[in-house]
Amino acid sequence: MVTQVRVYTINRGMLDSWITLFNEKIVPTSAKFGVEVVGAWANRPQNEFIWVRTFESEEKLKEYETSAERAAYMGQTGSHIAKTEVRNVENGLLSAVR
């Protein structure tokens, strides 16, 4: 299982339309290919959108990333996102901080 924390800087004035696109297109399309959205948050003062996703393997992610369904909305994502940061993280460490 692979877990990613993704931080997007969204172009000014586009955060609300990004959230709509995310909820209406990205989440359901991701789920169809086994890419689960674990959570999502907005940092409005910084125009940031932070989300966490998990997927079984790099191969499963590639299926999603090369799908026609994803390609159909990718032009819209590019117009919203100014900067992308992606971090692969380990699962199951919560008990270590209790």
Residue ranges and their predicted role:
Residues 20-38, 54-90:
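An amphipathic, aromatic/His-enriched active-site/gating alpha helix that lines ligand/cofactor pockets
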Residues 44-47:
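Short acidic/glycine-enriched loop/turn segments that link adjacent beta-strands
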Residues 6-8, 87:
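Conserved hydrophobic/aromatic positions in well-ordered beta-strands
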Residues 90-98:
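Short, low-order "capping/linker" segments at domain edges
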Residues 15, 60, 93-94:
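Generic "edge-of-domain/loop-turn" microfeature
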Residues 2-6, 30, 49-53:
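Short, structured motif recognition centered on aromatic/hydrophobic residues
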Residues 40-42:
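Short, solvent-exposed loop/turn elements at beta->coil junctions and helix N-caps
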Residues 9-19:
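Short, surface-exposed ligand-recognition loops at beta-strand->loop->(often short) alpha-helix junctions
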